[in-house]
Curated annotation (Swiss-Prot):
One Pfam family in the UniProt entry: Seryl_tRNA_N
Protein name: Serine--tRNA ligase
HAMAP family (alphabetical): Ser_tRNA_synth_type1
Organism: Variovorax paradoxus (strain S110)
Binding positions for L-serine per the UniProt entry: 250-252, 304, 403
A GO BP annotation: seryl-tRNA aminoacylation
Length: 443
């Protein structure tokens, strides 16, 4: 959530920043905000005037009563002022949630270093890496026609028909060797993030309440992207209030909420958390996109990284976390590139985002495998997540999140990049300890 003080002081500047996101929509209802703010100021001024007048009258009434002089007229005025003040205060209490509702629908402001653009065409490649050539090198082509992960995975136990039978489209079943590979990848990622990069491993609920999703920005704007959960015996639709429950779209949601309504000591920062969880997304608006294979699923696994940091250190943390995701790709010998997202392609809560895109030979292109974002104080303001600074004052933290990595897409990349002409898969050296020393996967 944006700082309302910023909007009050320089609304035009904030609107100009929002317009850089280049989406054809009013991010902020300026007329509604301006009208509510004008009414709020008027009510607040009048309430203060009433209180001052009541205080003055009360000072007069006491001495007059002591002298036995009549105070009926003054008392009548005090009572009238009290009634008016209560009415004004009641309206003020109504305006605050109305302003809050407006602000909850407003995205974060892009950082000055973010390129302005309408969509992914405006993104800027920062660097690329390949196992054959290192930094700056393109992915080396395979010496034979590449098969895609669907054909490679089928003999290894990748079963889309069973997934459709059990749950519908965009679900997958994995059995045997490929299920083992999937598990090994998740364990490998967790070990890198905990043992090498210092994240604390966490186990979190896969179902969270609406307040938790509001804190990280998924609600109220993106409810259509979520799966709502209904308790057994519950009639009708889930309640539209904070008692409603949803499947998590990412473990960023519960992990970041660890600091909701908390004031942490400055010495505790940075707080670095990671978790391996399934993620559930309705993929609303994705009809017809990536219908073949595992690239876009309703349920997928991810190892998430979250950092809660001092505001002065969040951009250093962004670069660090991007490197933490890159380390997984390099260890798995997967070619990739790092892309700085433009204003029109960034997520709702982000002020700056790097995407890591892995090379998929069968598609002859790079595909997103991780997004790493700095949200500055945007989530922290919604969460009321603060730290006590050196002056003893409470200050909002900055929050960052990133995939380290999406397990299913990493599985796809391993299959396609490490395939042999006969369809067998070379197991990357870093993964072999997680597969009992196995060097080759065959159907």
């Amino acid at each position: 959530m944006l700082d309302i003080t910023l909007l009050r002081k320089d609304l035009a500047s904030a609107v100009a920043g929002l317009e850089k996101r280049k989406k054809n929509q009013p991010y902020l209802d300026v007329s509604a905000f301006t009208a509510l703010e004008a009414e709020r100021k008027t009510l607040q001024t009048r309430t203060e005037e009433i209180q001052a007048r009541r205080n003055a009258l009360n000072k007069q009434i006491g001495p007059l009563k002591a002298k036995g002089e009549p105070v009926d007229a003054l008392m009548a005025e005090v009572n009238a002022l009290k009634a008016e003040q209560e009415s004004q205060s009641a309206r003020l209490d109504q305006i605050q949630p109305e302003l809050q509702a407006l602000l909850l629908a407003v995205p974060n402001l892009p950082h000055v270093s973010v390129p302005v653009g309408e969509d992914e065409a405006g993104n800027v490649e920062m660097r690329r890496w390949s196992p054959q050539g290192g930094a700056g090198a393109n992915a080396a082509p395979l010496p034979f026609a590449a098969k895609d992960h669907v054909d490679l995975g089928a003999p290894l136990g990748l079963d889309f028909e069973m997934g459709a039978k059990l749950a519908g489209s965009r679900f997958t079943v994995m059995k045997g060797p490929i299920a083992r590979l999937h598990r090994a990848l998740a364990q490998f990622m967790l070990d890198i993030q905990t043992e090498k990069h210092g994240y604390a491993e966490c186990y979190v609920p896969y179902i969270v309440n609406a307040a938790t999703l509001s804190g990280t920005g998924q609600l109220p704007k993106f409810e259509g992207d979520l799966f709502a959960a209904k308790k057994g015996g519950q009639e009708g639709e889930p309640a539209p209030d904070h008692s409603a429950l949803y499947l998590i779209p990412t473990s960023e949601v519960p992990l970041t909420n660890f600091v909701r309504d908390e004031v942490v000591a400055e010495a505790q920062l940075p707080i670095k958390l990671t978790a391996h969880t399934p993620c559930f997304r309705s993929e609303a608006g994705s009809a017809g996109r990536d219908t073949r294979g595992m690239i876009r699923q309703h349920q997928f696994d991810k190892v998430e990284m979250v950092q809660i940091v001092h505001p002065e250190k969040s951009y250093d943390a962004l670069e660090q976390m991007t490197g933490h995701a890159e380390a997984v790709l390099q260890a798995l010998e997967l070619p990739y590139r790092v892309v700085l997202l433009c204003t029109g392609d960034m997520g709702f809560g982000a002020t700056k985002t790097y995407d890591l895109e892995v090379w998929l030979p069968a598609q002859n292109t790079y595909r997103e495998i991780s997004s790493v974002s700095n949200c500055e104080a945007f989530q922290a303001r919604r969460l009321q997540a603060r730290f006590k600074n050196a002056q003893g004052k409470n200050e909002l933290v900055h929050t960052l999140n990133g995939s380290g990595l999406a397990v299913g897409r990493t599985l796809v990349a391993v299959l396609e990049n490490h395939q042999n002409e006969d369809g067998s898969i070379n197991v990357p050296a870093a993964l072999r300890p997680y597969l009992g020393g196995l060097e080759l996967l065959r159907g």
